[in-house]
């Protein structure tokens, strides 16, 4: 008999990639995340953070307002003992010293800087008890990217043994190991 999680993932993938008319209320169904009157990317990031056991964020650009949008949830996670890792860069000189100082105040998040040329990643990984989820797309950790701008992001969920999450985490770890602590 198939594991309940695997069955749920199969049904979610079938709805997301084969037949949109299938009934499936699972939170594992792939989703297009956009900013409009009905939804925004920030809400999806917060929803994933609220349910995760750990998280990894890789973004080129971060603003103080973007960080402020998540500060409460980051503090809540800290009180629950949930830790995260964040990689960013000095690409195009966008990130400010004040923003870096704000990042350093987040006790449960390790922060590193990469010097990879042209670093322009936008990836969010959330480890949950039985599965992982990821948001991959065009949204940096800025208030406008998460709430206002026209952005395309995909929310995908995967079994912890899935190849996609394995490869994404490997990319993150290689980048992490070759980055410097903030």
Located regions from the model:
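PLD/PLD-like phosphodiesterase catalytic module centered on the HKD motif
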Residues: 1-182
């Amino acid at each position: 008999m198939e594991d309940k999680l695997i069955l749920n993932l199969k049904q979610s993938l079938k709805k997301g990639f084969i037949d949109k008319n299938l009934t499936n209320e699972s939170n594992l169904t792939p989703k297009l995340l956009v900013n409009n009157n009905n939804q925004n990317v920030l809400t999806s990031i917060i929803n994933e953070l609220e349910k995760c056991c750990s998280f990894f964020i890789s973004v080129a650009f971060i603003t103080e307002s973007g960080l402020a949008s998540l500060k409460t949830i980051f503090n809540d996670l800290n009180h629950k003992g949930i830790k995260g890792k964040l990689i960013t860069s000095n690409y195009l000189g966008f990130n400010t010293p004040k923003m870096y100082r704000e990042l350093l105040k987040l006790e449960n998040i390790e922060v590193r800087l990469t010097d990879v040329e042209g670093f322009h990643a936008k990836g969010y990984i959330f480890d949950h008890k039985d599965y992982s989820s990821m948001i991959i797309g065009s949204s940096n950790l800025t208030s406008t990217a998460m709430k206002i701008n026209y952005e395309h992001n995909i929310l995908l969920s995967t079994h912890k043994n899935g190849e996609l999450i394995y490869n994404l985490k490997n990319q993150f770890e290689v980048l992490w190991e070759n980055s410097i602590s903030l």
